[in-house]
Amino acid sequence: MSDILGVVRARVREHFVRNGITAEPDTASVTFLGADRIDVMRFAGPGDVAVHYVSLGCSRYPMVDPTEMVADPVQGPRAEVVVALRGPSPAGLSRSVAVVAAAPAVEGLVLAPDALVDLEMPLWEGAPFTAFLLGRSDIEDVVLPDPLSPVVVLSAVPITATEAAWVRLKGAEAMREAWVQDGVDPTDPRRRAASPS
């Protein structure tokens, strides 16, 4: 399994090198009782660009829907998550990223685009955001040797409790459209919540 994580780490690093972030990432490790370690890699470029926090460990095993009678231990979907935020690293964010990445192993959650992962607590110290909205990221899928499924790196956008309620009511795409209409920058940790009509 460590080989899988090594491949994922290398491919993610290649993505950021191509985008001008050549420094080795800082890494924080988080371990939850009864679960394997989750690393959170921090890729920071020069200037006022968003810092990317990428999980490493979720893709160690394929995700399994707990309602399935028979789970495929090889070909099930695999994922990692990436959070992009501007500014200094907020205290507690790495733990929240690790909570999402550990959710498939701990809670049987299958991470997928448009999924809402509600932690019901601030994602970092003093944050108004309590949930993540998952979507496709610009990081390419990491192809693994056959017969293993590729690893999808999903974007995880911090959202407020009000926005989470909106996603439950209207859907993920409606939330994204509201951000565009309201001129909301989802990478701004001090942004206001969108006010969908």
Enumerate the language-model features and the residues they cover.
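Acidic, proline/glycine-rich low-complexity IDRs
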Residues: 1-197
